[in-house]
Curated annotation (Swiss-Prot):
Coiled coil: none annotated. InterPro entries: Alpha/beta_knot_MTases (IPR029028), Rbsml_bgen_MeTrfase_EMG1/NEP1 (IPR005304), Ribosome_NEP1_arc (IPR023503), tRNA_m1G_MTases_N (IPR029026). S-adenosyl-L-methionine binds at M141, T142, K143, G162, G167, I185, Y186, N187, K188, G189, L190. Methyltransferase involved in ribosomal biogenesis. Specifically catalyzes the N1-methylation of pseudouridine at position 914 (Psi914) in 16S rRNA. Is not able to methylate uridine at this position. It catalyses: pseudouridine(914) in M. jannaschii 16S rRNA + S-adenosyl-L-methionine = N(1)-methylpseudouridine(914) in M. jannaschii 16S rRNA + S-adenosyl-L-homocysteine + H(+). The record marks R54, R95, R98, R102 as: Interaction with substrate rRNA. This is Ribosomal RNA small subunit methyltransferase Nep1. Its EC number is 2.1.1.-. Belongs to the class IV-like SAM-binding methyltransferase superfamily. RNA methyltransferase NEP1 family. Pfam families: EMG1 (PF03587). Transmembrane segments: none annotated. Keywords: Methyltransferase, Ribosome biogenesis, RNA-binding, rRNA processing, rRNA-binding, S-adenosyl-L-methionine, Transferase. The gene is nep1.
Length: 205
């Protein structure tokens, strides 16, 4: 069986036009990708600022996913759905840079529309993506969901993990054909990359 793993509403985006004039590039950070560590002041009045500007979450999560046994067995479809409704389909054989800044360089090119044979980008909503991949049993990972033992994760074919630091993932369930359940794998909140690791490990064995 092949599973789908989606980092949703991910805090990975180009610097929004409305704050571009407030940001100056430096020797340390020369990328056009929003990062709250470097753009905190410019983001003060940005809508949903608490959810945005954390590409490091996506970087670490992808490193965990790509190096998992289930991915090496080619039984995983990997998607990044971004805050501004772009979807990146990650080829399972992608060798992602381990260096954060090199990762930003790759993602900046992809988000600007440069062709990459391992990372394909399209514009679509999360709901459209779920219907397109024919997701039937969908698990939204949330700390307030039904506590579920990791060994039961194989009952689902699609897993949605919030790719942002704070806030709640909103999804219009009426627009999704598949059955959606909110579940939790621990009684406290976990970082996205930890959740990704647990899911991938549980599906591998």
């Amino acid at each position: 069986m092949t599973y789908n793993i989606i980092l949703a509403k991910s805090a990975l985006e180009l610097i929004p036009e409305e704050i571009k004039n407030k940001i100056r590039k430096s020797r340390v950070y020369k990328y056009d990708i929003l990062d709250s560590n470097y753009h905190y002041k410019a983001m003060e009045k940005l809508k949903d600022k608490e959810m945005r500007g954390r590409p490091d979450i996506i970087h670490i999560s992808l490193l965990n996913i790509l190096d998992s046994p289930i991915n090496h067995e080619k039984k995983l479809n990997i998607y990044i759905h971004t805050y501004d409704d772009k979807v990146l389909k990650i080829n399972p054989e992608t060798r992602l840079p381990r260096n954060y800044f090199r990762f930003l360089g790759v993602m900046e090119k992809v988000l600007k529309g440069e062709r990459n044979h391992l990372i394909k980008m399209e514009e679509k909503t999360l709901e459209d993506l779920l219907n397109e991949i024919n997701a039937k049993k969908i698990a939204i990972m949330t700390k307030t969901g039904k506590l579920t033992h990791p060994k039961l994760l194989k009952e689902y074919d699609t897993f949605i993990i919030g790719g942002f630091p704070y806030g709640k993932l909103k999804i219009n369930k009426e627009k999704v054909f598949g059955d959606i359940k909110e579940i939790s794998i621990y009684n406290k909140g976990l970082m996205a990359w930890t959740v990704c690791g647990i899911i991938c490990y549980s599906l591998s064995f």
